[in-house]
Every structure is written in C-alpha cells, then in structure tokens.
C-alpha cells in the first residue's frame, strides 16, 4: 500500500511538473513564434548582416576574401565619425527576434554612448527607438560588463545581444550612427521572421534614453516621460553615478497611469527594491531584475516586467525619487532620509501602437558621454 501511494505521488509530481513547464513556456513562446514544435505558423526565417544586407534567400556570403568568394569576405565594416549605417530595411510583415553586435567597443570608453541606435516602424518619419547602443543593449555608463537577463546577454569582450520581439506590419528600418570622433569596427546580425500573423492591436517597440546630470533636488527623475494612448511598459536599464557618499537608493518608483494626478497607482518602496534586491545594491544579475555593474559609485541595474506586465489604457508616466539615507541627518531632522542629487540615466522599453508621438528630445553627444568613469567625491 505504501509503495502504491509513493508511486501515485511520484506520477502526480511528474505530471504536475510537465504541465507546469508547458504553462510557463506558453506565453513567451507565443511571442517568439509559437510552440517549439509548431511547424504551421506560416513564418519564414531570415537574417541580415554585412554578408547579406537585404536578408534575401540565397544572397548571403557572396563577398570575396583572400581565400576566395564566399570565404568570410565581408563580416565587418568600419563606421567613420558622423556616418550612419542602415542595419536593416525590411518590407512586409515580420518580427525582429534577436540582434547581436560586437566590434571596437570594449577598449573605447565612450563608444557605447556615442553610437546611437534608431528604429522606424511602418515608415513613420520619426524614430520609435532612439538610444545609445550600450544602453539599448543592456548596459549603462558605456560599460559592457558580462551578464545575462531575460532581455539581454553581454559577453566578456563586449558581445551584445537583445532578444525582445520587435514586430511590424509593413516596414522596419534600423540605423546605427557614430557620433564619436573615432572609426568603430562593427560586426552584427539581425535575426527575424517574415509572414508573421500579428494581432489586430499591435504594439511596436519604443525605446527612449534620458539622462539628468545632475538631477534636480526634490524633482523626481523621469524613467518614462508621459505617453498618451495605450501601451505596455516592458522595463528599463537604469544608470546611477553617485555624486556624494552615503546610501543613495531610498527613492521610490512611481507609475502614474490613466488619470493619476498627485499620487500614482503603482508605488514602490525603494530604488534597490524596484530591481528586486534589498538592503543596499549588490552586483547580482538575475533573469528579470538585478544589477550588472556596481563599482566606484557607478551602478547599472535593470527591471523587466515580463511575467508581471504593466499595461495602461490612456496615459502613463514613470518616475523615481532621489532620496538618500544617513544617520548624520537624524539629529537635525529626526530621520535618516534626505533629498539628494545624483547623475541618473535610463533606457526605457515599452510597446505602443502607431502612429505614436515623438520621443523626448535626445541628449547631444557631450551630455551623453560627460563624466564617464569619474569617481564620486567623498
């Protein structure tokens, strides 16, 4: 009897585990092309690189090297100062599934902030994505430290990956501009599908970059400046350069949506709490949250709202406070909390339908690269 009960329990456990795996995989697999075994999606796979800049069938690897035609003839290209390279120009319906890049980033401090990614969906004149390459690829402060999350993976030698689906119905164009003063070698590959059957209410990926150096005392930093219309907040890559000692991260994230005025619908409890760590900032990169860099007063952290979606129907604005903690303030104010100023940046990701409003004004090169790797004053 005991053996039968144990066998039943083991069988039930296996079935539960199996069903749990199927259930947990389904939502994300639906976004990335359906179940792994579904061969009836009607989609076709394509890839764009310098070896096949159009992604057309049978057109890859035609360039010639010293080894002959088709033998690694055009894997990379140097991007001159001021030059803009078209990464892809795709007609028809499809979804960009993955982008990989590497090149002359690792030993050039400013390169990941001086190079700018822009994306245009459905021939809209203004970009829906406008962001420094490093922040778009998951790392603040132009520091490509090795880590992995649900959205990004970064290798030790600045191999950069992003895995967010970027759907389009009629047209997709992405560019990369070198605003710096040095020639930068670029290797890249964009993997995408065509023939996708998108939902009627299709959100397109939007990404904006904001930096305040320094922030304004008692004026909360905007992670997502106000957007009108419906959308879904995906997450953000946040950079902090502390401008003084003491603990900097008591500020709360506030998500104002759908008519909120003075007080938000969603309110966090602290800066490190928002990225799901606690009692200070530890360099701990996890799947949906964490910190990929924490050294000498420079912090790069992230939060992805994939299993815990944040939707809005009419409008949304997201902020984070700049509040510190130090015992030296207790005698003066009765509390260890105090307002402070630091250097904050954000690369924020969300989906919204088209046509969409212009993104906030993009910071110029000087503003983007200022104070990289300056140690904070004690």
Q: What spans do the regions from the language model cover?
A:
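Beta-strand-centric surfaces of beta-sandwich/beta-rich domains
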Residues: 28-378
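Bacterial N-terminal signal peptides that target proteins for export
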Residues: 2-11
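Bacterial N-terminal signal peptides
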Residues: 10-21
């Amino acid at each position: 009897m005991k053996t039968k009960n144990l066998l039943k329990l083991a069988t039930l456990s296996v079935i539960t585990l199996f069903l749990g795996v199927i259930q947990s995989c389904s939502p994300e697999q639906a976004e990335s092309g359906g179940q792994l075994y579904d061969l009836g999606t009607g989609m076709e796979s394509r890839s764009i690189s310098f070896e096949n800049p159009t992604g057309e069938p049978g057109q890859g690897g035609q360039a010639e090297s010293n080894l002959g035609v088709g033998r690694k003839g055009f894997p990379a290209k140097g991007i001159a100062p001021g030059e803009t390279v078209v990464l892809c120009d795709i007609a028809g319906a499809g979804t960009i599934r993955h982008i990989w890049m590497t090149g002359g980033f690792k030993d050039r401090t400013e390169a990941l902030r001086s190079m700018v990614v822009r994306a245009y969906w459905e021939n809209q004149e203004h970009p829906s994505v406008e962001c420094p390459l490093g922040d778009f690829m998951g790392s603040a402060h132009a520091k490509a430290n090795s880590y992995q999350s649900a959205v990004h993976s970064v290798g030790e030698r600045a191999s950069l990956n992003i895995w967010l689906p970027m759907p389009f119905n009629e047209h997709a164009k992405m560019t990369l501009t070198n605003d710096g003063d040095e020639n930068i070698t670029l290797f890249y590959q964009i993997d995408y599908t065509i023939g996708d059957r998108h939902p009627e209410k299709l959100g397109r990926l939007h990404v904006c970059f904001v930096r305040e150096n320094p922030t304004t005392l008692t004026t909360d930093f905007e992670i997502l400046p106000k957007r009108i219309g419906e959308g879904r907040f995906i997450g953000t890559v946040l950079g902090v350069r502390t401008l003084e000692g003491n603990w900097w991260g008591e500020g709360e994230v506030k998500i104002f949506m759908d008519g909120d005025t003075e007080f938000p619908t969603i309110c966090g409890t602290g800066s490190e709490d928002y990225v799901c760590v606690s009692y200070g900032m530890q360099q701990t990169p996890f799947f949906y949250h964490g910190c990929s860099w924490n050294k000498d007063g420079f912090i790069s952290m992230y939060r992805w709202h994939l299993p815990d979606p944040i939707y809005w129907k009419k409008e949304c604005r997201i902020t984070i406070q700049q509040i510190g903690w130090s015992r030296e303030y207790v005698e003066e104010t009765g509390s260890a909390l105090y307002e402070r100023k630091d250097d904050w940046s954000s690369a924020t990701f969300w989906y919204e339908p088209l046509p969409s409003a212009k993104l906030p004004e993009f910071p110029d090169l000087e503003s983007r690269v200022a104070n990289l790797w300056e140690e904070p004053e004690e």
